[in-house]
């Protein structure tokens, strides 16, 4: 990872795309934020007219032993159940990927049990669940970096298959707790401000969850100036791998679409490791989780819609894929003012 370089956002390509948009057969700037999205995609890819015929979502799965303390509405075993469901095509993310024409890869980076019998699963297990960070570090620094490398490697493998648009998804019961911890440490917001209902827990359990997060931060004392330290002490394997996918995608000029709260926490880690990643990411939706918009505002990454989502899996990110297709089709398929006879 030390040799990973992030290319600069191409102002030249972005400006060329904006000039092209302004000369198309429509009222100037009349497509609003769709045009902003097209310009951002041009700058990320370095191409005036980018295209994304091959799209992918990489979903990283891991468990969290803090889930054993009742921070989630379901038990830790649901992570494995959903992984098995995803590889069979039965999840929300599967349906949304089919709708968007995107391929889904499901990667075991830290599920509690071994899943040797699961066909179609990408096996990159670094550990058998993150440790309970309310009692000590979730991972060693070496484990965290190994998980980040899994994500970088997956970005490279997807690129080798011809993928030009990526999103990072996740499955991990209890993973809003490390996401809240990361958000609090990196943004300076209070734990209460960034801790929500997650999988649908009642208010008294939200308070319990926030208390555990506060204790974990106090015990581990993560250094906000060292993103890997934060990741190792209060993060988790799938968060690390997601940040790696963002780092890897950015290094290859592949736009990576950021999903909701957990992906936002992973983005904060990726940007902490390589600040240039910020300009190479695409926001998607504003999550119901209170910490999400705090994170995205802190990172300076705009979001494009609010459907009241809080599922994760990469579902909000892949919903943006058809809008991305529409944005780039404007650049490549619309006629110009001159082309319709206007002077």
Model-derived features with residue positions:
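N-terminal loops that bind phosphate or other acidic moieties
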Residues: 1-343
């Amino acid at each position: 990872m030390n040799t990973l370089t992030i290319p600069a956002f191409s102002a030249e390509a972005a400006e060329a795309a904006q000039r092209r948009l302004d000369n198309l057969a429509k009222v100037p700037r009349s497509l609003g934020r769709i045009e902003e999205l097209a310009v951002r995609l041009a700058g990320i890819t370095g191409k005036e007219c980018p295209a994304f015929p091959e799209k992918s979502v990489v979903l990283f799965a891991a468990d969290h032993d803090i889930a054993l303390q009742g921070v989630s509405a379901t038990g830790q075993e649901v992570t494995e159940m959903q992984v098995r469901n995803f590889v069979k095509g039965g999840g929300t993310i599967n349906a949304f990927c089919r709708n968007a024409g995107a391929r889904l890869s499901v990667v075991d980076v830290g599920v509690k049990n071994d899943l040797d019998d699961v066909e179609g699963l990408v096996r990159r297990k670094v550990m058998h669940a993150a440790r309970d960070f309310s009692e000590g570090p979730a991972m060693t620094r070496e484990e965290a970096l190994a998980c980040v490398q899994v994500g970088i490697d997956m970005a490279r493998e997807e690129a080798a298959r011809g993928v030009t648009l990526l999103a990072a998804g996740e499955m991990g019961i209890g993973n809003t707790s490390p996401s809240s911890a990361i958000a609090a440490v990196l943004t300076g917001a209070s734990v209460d401000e960034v801790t929500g209902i997650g999988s649908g827990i009642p208010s008294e359990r939200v308070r319990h969850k926030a208390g555990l997060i506060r204790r974990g931060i106090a015990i581990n004392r993560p250094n906000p100036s060292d993103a890997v330290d934060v990741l190792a002490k209060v993060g988790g394997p799938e968060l690390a791998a997601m940040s790696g996918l963002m780092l890897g995608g950015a290094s290859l000029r592949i736009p990576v679409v950021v999903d909701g709260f957990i992906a936002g926490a992973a983005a904060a880690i990726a940007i902490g490791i390589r600040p240039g990643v910020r300009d190479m990411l695409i926001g998607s939706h504003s999550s119901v989780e209170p910490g999400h918009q705090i994170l995205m505002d802190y990172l300076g990454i705009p979001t494009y819609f609010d459907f009241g989502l809080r599922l994760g899996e990469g579902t909000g990110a892949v919903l943006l894929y058809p809008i991305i297709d529409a944005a780039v089709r404007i650049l490549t398929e619309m006629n110009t003012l001159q082309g319709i006879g206007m002077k």
